[in-house]
Amino acid sequence: MAAEEAEVVSPLIVDTAPDTSGTAAASLAAAVSAAAAAARTGSQAQVSKAALAAKLMSLSGVFAVHKPKGPTSAELLNRLKEKLLAEAGLPSPEWNKRQKQTLKVGHGGTLDSAAQGVLVVGIGRGTKMLTSMLSGSKRYIATGELGKATDTLDSTGKVTEEKPYDKITQEDIEGILQKFTGNIMQVPPLYSALKKDGQRLSTLMKRGETVEARPARPVTVHSISLLKYQPPFFTLDVECGGGFYIRSLVSDIGKELSSCATVLELTRTKQGPFTLAQHALPEDRWTINDIAQSLKRCTSLLPEELTFKKSKSEPSSDQALSCGYITLRETKREDDTVKTL
């Protein structure tokens, strides 16, 4: 939510007019105008580029992309921006956080570099609405390995402990899952987006600095089920609320079984109304037209009566957005940050 009074719209509404407020939008508007002027005396290709640039400016809302393993969520956003600007024939900006960017995109809910799946993206004024996606439900498929612990709680880290697991049965795992369901307390991993003195704990850990464990905090798990157990590997289907760490869950399950465990594979299959199978655009469909269609499709997921009330005062850090059938609480948490580039 912006600090100033503004019209609050659904995060999934596609604007028909460009957002020309602010230096960043003005810079893009100038680039589009220049492209259009050149097109008036140029080739059909130039006309097409000018039309694409104008269409890119008009995009505003929230959609989903498929994040593969490897890049960070921020790196993926940079790649998305570069592809869209290149398609429209507009200059690609220097990735300097101190500079105003011509095209605003953001994501609502980080995925680790080793993870894959649904990444919710806001474009244009849609970036202002990403906070509401953070506290919503998410669903994951996670594969863990018993008998091994790492410093990062996943396969990218160094092995710190090994314990026997040969006596653990499928019934043992299924029997403890109820302990991790509902409103529970969870200690977040040290390798995380949580911050100390303005720096991420993961950054401090990589530099070899000593970092104290954070206290347990309340989180919500809607459901957990064991999909497969082939020792030492087990696969879980987890639906949870915001601020929940699958890596911590798998580690805690290992400890509860008098062993240890770490995450091998992690896929986010759903965030809010967006599913990996139906809504997440793969990279070969990161085009202006495909994203425009995706924005319209995402809008259709919401009931027509879904509207957000206009706030007449500056929002607090814990503001409720009320709509016809649900209330989304915008609670700012250190790890649940909206990344905007």
UniProtKB/Swiss-Prot annotation:
Q: Which residues are named in the active-site annotation? A: D112
Keywords of this entry: Acetylation, Cytoplasm, Isomerase, mRNA processing, Nucleus, tRNA processing
Q: Which Gene3D superfamilies has this protein been placed in?
A: Pseudouridine synthase
Protein's UniProt keywords contain Acetylation: yes
Gene Ontology annotations of biological process type:
mRNA processing; mRNA pseudouridine synthesis; positive regulation of pre-miRNA processing; tRNA modification
Q: What family does the Swiss-Prot or TrEMBL record give for this protein?
A: Belongs to the pseudouridine synthase TruB family.
Q: What is this protein called?
A: Pseudouridylate synthase TRUB1
